[in-house]
Amino acid sequence: MAQFDVLKNPGQQQEAIPFVVVLQNARFDRSTTRFVAPLVLSRLANIVEHYLAPRFIIHGVEVVMDVFNLATLPVNRMGTPVASLADEESRVKLMRALDDFLSQA
């Protein structure tokens, strides 16, 4: 699966977190896990800083990225991608949120 692919959440909180987005660079595809961010239903998200929680519409569902709950998932638990956030606008929003979250400033 490619960086910025969106997959159905294989975890237990699928109602609140219907999707995850793969953040890991393809250079590390040999790994048995993928670094992902949960995509939480926007109406349930506790957004502290809006720039840290970019909004997306996935199959008609409004979600926000939750940078405070980044995780790794085993590849064998992940299904087929259902969407992609690899377009330039989405990539910029994702990377800006991650950069701000991880910045040393």
Regions found by a protein language model. Give the residues of each.
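C-terminal terminal-subdomain/extension
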Residues: 56-105
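Compact nucleic-acid interaction/catalytic patches
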Residues: 3-6, 10, 14-55
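Short N-terminal helix-initiation segments at or just after the protein's N-terminus
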Residues: 1-5, 43, 85, 98-99
